[in-house]
Amino acid sequence: MRQALPLVTRQGDRIAIVSGLRTPFARQATAFHGIPAVDLGKMVVGELLARSEIPADAIEQLVFGQVVQMPEAPNIAREIVLGTGMNVHTGAYSVSRACATSFQAVANVAESLMAGTIRAGIAGGADSSSVLPIGVSKALARALVDVNKARTTRQRLTLFSRLRLRDLLPVPPAVAEYSTGLRMGDTAEQMAKTYGITREQQDALAHRSHQRAAQAWAEGKLAEEVMTTYVPPYKNPFAEDNNIRGTSTLADYAKLRPAFDRKHGSVTAANSTPLTDGAAAVILMTESRAKELGLRPLGYLRSYAFTAIDVWQDMLLGPAWSTPLALERAGLTMADLTLFDMHEAFAAQTLANLQLLGSERFAREVLGRAQATGEVDDAKFNVLGGSIAYGHPFAATGARMITQTLHELRRRGGGFGLVTACAAGGLGAAMVLEAE
């Protein structure tokens, strides 16, 4: 094992995660229909600051992400600063690492803290699958540029006359990988077949996720970390995630047809995460700054790791690659963890990663490591459910997982937790958290 890399400032301060908050997560075109991601981001950051009672000018940086970006607000981070009453001099920039975007935002703020350029910052992400950048065809886009440069009406009419009817149809955002043309669900199907993961196993994991998420809400475990929102026409509050199937039975999952490989597949809408709207954010500070402000941190960032692999096969194995690296940098092993939380993009992807984390062969032949990362104890795994139940607003999921894991660690008396996610483009992320 390589030497651990402590995440501390030049003065020896740990990176404290002071608080975290998210909106309820809403299925596409439901509670947040028509609400753009930038407004969701403003909601959560504004409420986070109000609850924390931290002076707005104490926040020196805001790093925020959005995967499905809107052309009219390309820097969502700066719009949030300007729309929440924060100090206009607060530095703000946007990041994107697909489904690991808020992991990246947290890492960036942590690096600024370690460099000593700031003492407090906010990281997070927001996405809306209900407000999408519907585009135009390449032919129409080119014609519009040429028309703008045309000097006469005749030239403009000539340019438009070259267009076909299909060129005028709207173009929705792509759901496939740009480099391969594969959808993430196609990769999930490939991984299910490659690693022998059955439909029954996938449905069982999805059912487990929903049952545990429903139980977490019923026991009041999420109330502190999820805000109540009000959206037009402001008649009813929206306070709880609306994707969770608390009353479903395992038999209900078997009724759905495969969504990607319709003849021989096993990946369905029920054992995959749904398209979702929502936002989440966390406040990070140096440990000494938190003490100055009289704040008790939720916990601390112990380590993080980002990885990248090939996109043609096993593209969603990011957790199996990034987890051992994050553990190594933290100076820990799988046995040291109190909690292990993995983003459930698909049940097939989740089960494949769990399988390979415990595989000696994968460790030796693929990772070049002497031994397996370690089996994940079911009693520590996604104990409050996961993304299949809560939903997955792409850029917000990491911040949800971090906040949720730290609160649960605190309820258990402290310890270490690891959060990890796969992401489009063969990317992976993992972070080790510590609570006292």
Curated annotation (Swiss-Prot):
<dbReference type="GO" id="GO:0003988">
    <property type="term" value="F:acetyl-CoA C-acyltransferase activity"/>
</dbReference>
<feature type="active site" description="Proton acceptor">
    <location>
        <position position="392"/>
    </location>
</feature>
<keyword id="KW-0442">Lipid degradation</keyword>
<dbReference type="InterPro" id="IPR012806">
    <property type="entry name" value="Ac-CoA_C-AcTrfase_FadI"/>
</dbReference>
<keyword id="KW-0276">Fatty acid metabolism</keyword>
<protein>
    <recommendedName>
        <fullName>3-ketoacyl-CoA thiolase</fullName>
        <ecNumber>2.3.1.16</ecNumber>
    </recommendedName>
</protein>
<keyword id="KW-0963">Cytoplasm</keyword>
<dbReference type="InterPro" id="IPR020617">
    <property type="entry name" value="Thiolase_C"/>
</dbReference>
<comment type="subunit">
    <text>Heterotetramer of two alpha chains (FadJ) and two beta chains (FadI).</text>
</comment>
<feature type="active site" description="Acyl-thioester intermediate">
    <location>
        <position position="99"/>
    </location>
</feature>
<dbReference type="GO" id="GO:0006635">
    <property type="term" value="P:fatty acid beta-oxidation"/>
</dbReference>
<dbReference type="InterPro" id="IPR020610">
    <property type="entry name" value="Thiolase_AS"/>
</dbReference>
<dbReference type="InterPro" id="IPR020613">
    <property type="entry name" value="Thiolase_CS"/>
</dbReference>
<feature type="active site" description="Proton acceptor">
    <location>
        <position position="422"/>
    </location>
</feature>
<keyword id="KW-0443">Lipid metabolism</keyword>
<keyword id="KW-0012">Acyltransferase</keyword>
<dbReference type="GO" id="GO:0005829">
    <property type="term" value="C:cytosol"/>
</dbReference>
<dbReference type="InterPro" id="IPR020615">
    <property type="entry name" value="Thiolase_acyl_enz_int_AS"/>
</dbReference>
<dbReference type="Pfam" id="PF00108">
    <property type="entry name" value="Thiolase_N"/>
</dbReference>
<dbReference type="InterPro" id="IPR020616">
    <property type="entry name" value="Thiolase_N"/>
</dbReference>
<dbReference type="InterPro" id="IPR002155">
    <property type="entry name" value="Thiolase"/>
</dbReference>
<comment type="similarity">
    <text>Belongs to the thiolase-like superfamily. Thiolase family.</text>
</comment>
<comment type="pathway">
    <text>Lipid metabolism; fatty acid beta-oxidation.</text>
</comment>
<dbReference type="Pfam" id="PF02803">
    <property type="entry name" value="Thiolase_C"/>
</dbReference>
<keyword id="KW-0808">Transferase</keyword>
<dbReference type="InterPro" id="IPR016039">
    <property type="entry name" value="Thiolase-like"/>
</dbReference>
<comment type="function">
    <text>Catalyzes the final step of fatty acid oxidation in which acetyl-CoA is released and the CoA ester of a fatty acid two carbons shorter is formed.</text>
</comment>
